Amino acid sequence: MNVLEQLMTYYAQNGSYVMDEFGRHFLMSAYGVLFAAVVGVPAGILIAHFRRLSAWVFAVTNVIQTIPALAMLAVLMLVMGLGANTVILSLFLYSLLPIIRNTYTGIISIEHAYLESGKAMGMTKFQVLRMVELPLALSVIMAGLRTALVIAIGITAIGTFVGAGGLGDMIVRGSNATNGTAIILAGAIPTAVMAVGADLLMAWLERALSPVKKKRTGAKHVQSAA
């Protein structure tokens, strides 16, 4: 059998296993990015308002980003042991930089006139943040989440080395087999599909949440009503 036939046979015989590992892979990636968003978005907002802190925060997150993923997993494994939690923590650390950076960029790029208009209407600082800054910066923040999620999906593939499972299991198993090209592809193809699908979904959300698009949509509704 050629590689394509071997691949189809593998999927036919191990379809439920592949789907289980696909779900496990995605959940680890999503949890890592979600936890990073819970920390990274407030951190980005904070350093956007207290810019003296930005150099320190970016210095730390840039250093984290330079550590090879396998080395990070090895160090965290010594502390947390084997399993998915080690991978999720490493994804959390790697996702901080794109999320914090985009949140910071989105907030500081808002025109000062919008902020002054909010203050002139009697808004508190929290109301300006909630009703002016976050809506205008949301598409940029989503771009950071998009980058973080795609990176996380790739890093999760090597989580198999710390016993986390995921699609990387098939890639490693195929690498160790005598004629394992089909097994490698059985793990690599779903990983690529997941990354591309996540990127397209997040790109759509980014466009949907863009304030420019909302403004144009609102203008069309006004014109049609007129």
From Swiss-Prot:
Q: Which residues form the signal peptide?
A: none
Q: Which PROSITE patterns match?
A: ABC_TM1 (PS50928)
**Membrane topology, as annotated:** Multi-pass membrane protein
Q: Where in the cell is it found?
A: Cell membrane
* ABC transmembrane type-1 domain boundaries: 22-202
**What upregulates it?**
Repressed by GbsR.
The record's CDD domains line, in alphabetical order, gives:
TM_PBP2
Does the entry feature the keyword Thylakoid, yes or no?
no
Q: Which organism is it from?
A: Bacillus subtilis (strain 168)
Coarsely, its chief localization is membrane
Q: What is the effect of changing residue 30 to V?
A: In strain: ATCC 6633 / PCI 219
Origin: domain of life: Bacteria
Q: What family classification does the UniProt entry report for this protein?
A: Belongs to the binding-protein-dependent transport system permease family. CysTW subfamily.
User: Which key words are in the record?
Assistant: Amino-acid transport, Cell membrane, Membrane, Transmembrane, Transmembrane helix, Transport
The membrane-spanning stretches of this chain are: 27-47, 52-72, 73-93, 148-168, 182-202
User: What GO CC terms are in its UniProt record?
Assistant: plasma membrane
Q: Which GO terms describe its biological process?
A: amino acid transport; transmembrane transport
What is this protein's function per UniProt?
Answer: Involved in a high affinity multicomponent binding-protein-dependent transport system for choline; probably responsible for the translocation of the substrate across the membrane.
Instruction: Report the protein name in the record.
Output: Choline transport system permease protein OpuBD
